[in-house]
Swiss-Prot record:
Disulfide bonds: none annotated. Residues 126-139 have a biased composition (Pro residues). The modification Phosphoserine is found at S203. It is found in: Nucleus. A zinc finger (NR C4-type) spans 13-33, 49-73. Residues 222-459 form the NR LBD domain. Keywords: Acetylation, Activator, DNA-binding, Isopeptide bond, Lipid-binding, Metal-binding, Nucleus, Phosphoprotein, Receptor, Repressor, Transcription, Transcription regulation, Ubl conjugation, Zinc, Zinc-finger. One of its GO terms (molecular function) is RNA polymerase II cis-regulatory region sequence-specific DNA binding. This is Steroidogenic factor 1. A 1,2-diacyl-sn-glycero-3-phosphocholine binds at G341, Y436, K440. The gene is NR5A1. GO terms for biological process: female gonad development; hormone-mediated signaling pathway; male gonad development; positive regulation of gene expression; regulation of transcription by RNA polymerase II; sex determination; tissue development. There is a cross-link at K119, K194 (Glycyl lysine isopeptide (Lys-Gly) (interchain with G-Cter in SUMO)).
Length: 461
């Protein structure tokens, strides 16, 4: 749905620089980019770029490369789910609260400009400095190994990490008897790790959930109820770390000639994902869905949730020259540069750039849990039995995040939009990571019984 716009604010389309005509699909854009985005989504068009996928898009050149134009539409924040699938006029009215608040902010901004006698100019987002350049090189430390917390034995020595090629992966609708079945409901056939207690972990002495949960967060004024509930669902990080380290101490079931460091990273990712599945099972709305819908949602976003979990850990870590693993171990980026191939190294550096961007945005825990919820309830997923419930969850999370950012970061009026743009980059990173894993699998380099590979294969069947 299009919303009226104050022309005297004189903003330019973030895609091509043409004059803005109104709010279209979640963003202020021109009429041309509005129509282009709508036609692309409704007709399910797929473009290719004849150059290097970095074509300049402006008012005069916007029709030369539809691939780069559509990518820019997504990058600046146009929303796929706002386009109606039935080709009727008018978009899906899910961004009404955002439009109204955004308009109020712009009216306030216009009044300040008139009062101060300044001319409104387009520029970088308010309160968000540009990310610094990639970190410099550092001295190489010893290789990757399992840490030794609380008396656990040390892990095997490190080995080199490999390289890969990266063609696109096919995407398909998952089935209900895939790799997640045994995690969501233990009665379903699946792998050995069940929904409550993963097999490599010893049963706790007293009954209870697999992970400890913090005390309810009071939050103070301006914290929406949804975010308060999500904060209570977050598992205790120390317990998650201890469980994953304990699992890594178990004898590996993979190929014995595999590089130890790569095997460990795969097993870390597996166990991290299991903790994410446990979190999802406890989420409001998600636990109300049928098992088939639960599996569809998780199989759609598992890689994004893993990437976002890693990114937020680095934001908390706060060190540009190293990466903090889920086990609590620091790995210098130059270790990756020395042991990994150029493509994997590029993926790590790209992730680091996103970390710097989120750090500049001052991403906090309240925003993290809400964004994670938004990733889980993506409206891009098709063939859901209860799409309306997922849509309602997405709308409530969007509203909660917008209200929170406006209340707690009034000096950054566009923080809500900038956070959603970060999710676009999270998705791009997750696709690149899946391509890396898949080609490791094709090269017979992945550990056996790897859950992530099973997730990839479920996408293709």
């Amino acid at each position: 749905m299009d919303y009226s716009y104050d022309e005297d604010l004189d903003e330019l389309c973030p895609v091509c620089g043409d004059k803005v005509s109104g709010y279209h699909y979640g963003l202020l854009t021109c009429e041309s980019c509005k129509g282009f985005f709508k036609r692309t989504v409704q007709n399910n068009k797929h473009y290719t770029c004849t150059e290097s996928q970095s074509c300049k898009i402006d008012k005069t050149l916007r029709k030369r490369c539809p691939f780069c134009r559509f990518q820019k539409c997504l990058t600046v924040g146009m929303r796929l789910e706002a386009v109606r699938a039935d080709r009727m006029r008018g978009g899906r009215n899910k961004f009404g609260p955002m439009y109204k608040r955004d308009r109020a902010l712009k009216q306030q901004k216009k009044a300040q400009i008139r009062a101060n006698g300044f001319k409104l100019e387009t520029g970088p987002p308010m309160g968000v400095p540009p990310p610094p350049p990639p970190p410099p090189d550092y001295m190489l430390p010893p290789g990757l190994h399992v840490p030794e917390p609380k008396g656990l034995a040390s892990g095997p020595p490190a080995g080199p990490l490999g390289d890969f090629g990266a063609p696109a992966l096919p995407m398909a609708v998952p089935s209900t008897n895939g790799p997640l079945a045994g995690y969501l409901y233990p009665a379903f056939p699946g792998r050995a790790i069940k929904s409550e207690y993963p097999e490599p972990y010893a049963s706790p002495p007293q009954p209870g959930p697999p992970y400890g949960y913090p005390e309810p967060f009071s939050g103070g004024p301006g914290v929406p109820e949804l975010i308060l509930q999500l904060l209570q669902l977050e598992p205790d990080e120390d317990q998650v770390r201890a469980r994953i380290i304990g699992c890594l101490q178990e004898p590996a079931k993979g190929r014995p000639d595999q590089p130890a460091s790569f095997n460990l990273l795969c097993r870390m990712a597996d166990q991290t994902f299991i903790s994410i599945v446990d979190w999802a099972r406890r989420c409001m709305v998600f636990k109300e869905l049928e098992v088939a819908d639960q599996m569809t949602l998780l199989q759609n976003c598992w890689s994004e949730l893993l990437v976002f979990d890693h990114i937020y850990r680095q934001v908390q870590h706060g060190k540009e020259g190293s990466t903090l693993l889920v086990t609590g171990q620091e790995v210098e980026l130059t270790t990756v540069a020395a042991q990994a191939g150029s493509l994997l190294h590029g993926l790590v550096l790209r992730a680091q750039e996103l970390v710097l961007q989120m750090h500049a945005l001052q991403l906090d825990r309240q925003e993290f849990v809400c964004l994670k919820f938004l990733i889980l309830f993506s409206l891009d997923v098709k063939f859901l039995n209860n799409h309306s419930l997922v849509k309602d969850a997405q709308e409530k999370a969007n509203t909660a995040l917008l209200d929170y950012t406006l209340c707690h970061y009034p000096h950054c009026g566009d923080k809500f939009q900038q956070l959603l743009l970060c999710l676009v980059e999270v998705r791009a990173l997750s696709m690149q990571a899946k391509e890396y894993l898949y080609h490791k699998h094709l090269g017979n380099e992945m550990p056996r019984n790897n859950l992530l590979i099973e997730m990839l294969q479920a996408k293709q069947t």
